[in-house]
Amino acid sequence: MRRIITFILIVAFVSQSHGWGATGHRVTGMIATNHLNKKAKKRIEALLGQESLAMASTWMDDIRSDSTYNYASDFHWVTVESGQTYDQSKKNPNGDVIMTIERLITELKSGKLDRTSEIRNLKFLVHLVGDIHQPLHVGCCDDQGGNKVQVKWFGGNSNLHRVWDSDIIEGTKLSYTELAQSLGAPDEATIKRLQSGNVRDWANEAMTYRTQVYETGNGNLGYNYSYKNLPLIRERLLAAGVRLAGVLNDIYGK
């Protein structure tokens, strides 16, 4: 019984600490798949086999209990103080989401990775492009990306990071396929606009939402907070998927 309780506590901690929840990440993976060109799709399928990008998107969270990957624990996030740029910010010697995405893209483009390393890097990339579009993964303070900001969510205990990772999304009662489909198909102009920037542009964009994210009033969150922020979450998921497709087409589709 003690082992079961310990396992439940570990799962609860992991689920509220890193990335969009499974639904959000899988939405991003599904949208990306829908925007891959034929060559990129074929090459990615050759690497992942029957595993879709949607399913591969959560692998980086799934392996958190494997100590082999402890080195990757800081890859999910970055801290950039308000008023600073990433270049001006203090860097984490263990890495962060920005430098890791940039490194993964460079390594995947090089064509020098063995198959196992390429698959690992691909799965890392799919996950982290999702992470950087969750505004609290580009943190500004010492609150661990909102994990230390305790709030009530429809009367239950939660924290701001968890609200953005999964609480609002779970409130839609939609599967990842239903949520992805509900976002619609962006037109060519929107795709071009979303894919025109780079990783640091994405981080700068995430920083612009800080005021909105932290407007929690007395901390009793529910319908009003969800109503105000669900449209932004939907936009973030769509942008992440389209941009991920752009990166993958650049790596595998030329």
Q: Which residues are covered by each model-predicted region?
A:
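N-terminal, motif-rich segments that launch catalysis or mediate targeting to/interaction with membranes
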Residues: H18-L128, P135, C141-K254
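Sec-dependent N-terminal signal peptides
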Residues: I4-F13
